[in-house]
């Protein structure tokens, strides 16, 4: 994808380089388009450099090689203080409260498109760019819209729903128009060291480590009982924080423990008794709900979509979008009704709304219900 150089030489773009193929190709494309490109490597986590697990040093090594190859200057900045205060402490507090947070969404909101953006502006940047699979469109009035990436399998708009107009107006997502195999092809053609580098998986600061081992360093585990809906003890857990709703693996309960022989799923948590409630079968009512409540709303346009408008939403990243409507919005809390019941709606996770290709924004789930009357009873 060799692009003819436009007269972009007076426009400085600082690219957040992670050491992966996506951000590498982001820098490559902008360089080909004639922008004044600089790279910035963010260190968001302290404590790994002396451990056996040390991805940051390897990533920085790859970033240095990319910058040398593309002949662009590199800034290395430590945002670990901001990350700890704005992302990680919230992550721990949510787990202590029995919820399941999504720190990658908060990292985008508080670090990549806040701390990094602000710092880039002090370095004279006109824009920042990242290797996200999403797109930004602008209308004649300067209003920005967040669109899904063209690669449906890689679309990351779900993780970017918190971005506001100012952040979008200063951001670029050059690979949002491309599909992942082509991104790798471009990297290989340009002889970039990252062309065959494995995609990172899992929560950014945990990486390939075992989640349980990592969390134990910060939160004391409180073992307890796993009970069925009758309150009968059917197993034991090592800590509620290790279980997310709808989880099947790791319960240690044989499928034949109950009468049905169906597999067991974690369905609810009782923080007062430190009990995990498990049910049999993925179609159990405790696992499936048509209503949810959510707060901490972020709308790309700056305001909530029209109530009872036909929308689509998803309650987890890999879920296909589901038809729904927002029934009410009051004091920063919304009530959402789906056309069909959704499995394992999880407090702490985000519900993100779409209208066609456009991501409208989202909110953090606070509860899941079978009816409006059930919501009113809970108030």
UniProtKB/Swiss-Prot annotation:
GO molecular function term, any single one: tRNA binding
Source taxon at top rank: Bacteria
Subcellular location: Cytoplasm
Enzyme Commission number(s) of this protein: 2.8.1.13
Site (Interaction with tRNA): 132, 349
One family name in Pfam for this protein: tRNA_Me_trans_M
Residue positions of the active site: 107, 204
Protein name (Swiss-Prot/TrEMBL): tRNA-specific 2-thiouridylase MnmA
Native source organism of the sequence: Hydrogenovibrio crunogenus (strain DSM 25203 / XCL-2) (Thiomicrospira crunogena)
GN (gene name): mnmA
């Amino acid at each position: 994808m060799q692009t003819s150089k436009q007269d972009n030489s007076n426009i400085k773009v600082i690219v957040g380089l992670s050491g992966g193929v996506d951000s590498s190709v982001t820098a490559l494309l902008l360089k080909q388009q004639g922008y004044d490109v600089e790279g910035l490597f963010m260190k968001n986590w302290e404590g790994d450099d002396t451990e056996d697990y040390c991805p940051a040093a390897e990533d920085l090594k790859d970033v240095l090689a990319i910058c040398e190859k593309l002949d662009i200057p590199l800034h290395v900045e430590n945002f670990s203080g901001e990350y700890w205060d704005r992302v990680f402490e919230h992550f721990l507090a949510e787990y202590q409260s029995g919820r399941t947070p999504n720190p990658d969404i908060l990292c985008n909101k508080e670090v990549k498109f806040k701390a990094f953006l602000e710092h880039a502006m002090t370095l004279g940047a006109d824009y920042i760019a990242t290797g996200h699979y999403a797109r930004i469109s602008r209308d004649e009035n300067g209003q920005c819209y967040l669109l899904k990436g063209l690669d449906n399998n890689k679309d990351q708009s779900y993780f970017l729903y918190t971005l506001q107009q100012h952040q979008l107006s200063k951001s670029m997502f050059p690979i949002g128009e491309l599909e992942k195999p082509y991104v790798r092809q471009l990297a290989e053609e340009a002889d970039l060291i990252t062309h065959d580098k494995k995609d990172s998986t899992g929560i950014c600061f945990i990486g390939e480590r075992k989640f349980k081992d990592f969390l134990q360093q910060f939160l004391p585990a409180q073992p307890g009982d796993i009970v069925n809906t009758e309150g009968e003890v059917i197993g034991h857990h090592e800590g509620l924080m290790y279980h997310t709703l709808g989880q099947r693996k790791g319960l240690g309960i044989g499928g034949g423990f109950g009468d049905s022989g169906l597999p067991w799923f974690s369905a609810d948590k009782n923080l007062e008794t430190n009990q995990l409630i498990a049910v049999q079968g993925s179609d159990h009512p405790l696992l499936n709900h048509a209503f949810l409540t959510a707060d901490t709303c972020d709308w790309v346009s700056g305001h909530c979509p029209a109530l009872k408008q036909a929308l689509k939403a998803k309650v987890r990243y890999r879920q296909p979008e589901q038809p729904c409507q927002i029934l009410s919005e009051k004091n920063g809390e919304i009530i959402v009704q789906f056309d069909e019941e959704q499995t394992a709606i999880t407090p702490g996770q985000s519900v993100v709304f779409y209208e066609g290709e456009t991501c409208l924004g989202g909110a953090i789930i606070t509860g899941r219900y079978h009816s409006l009357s059930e919501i009113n009873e809970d108030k």
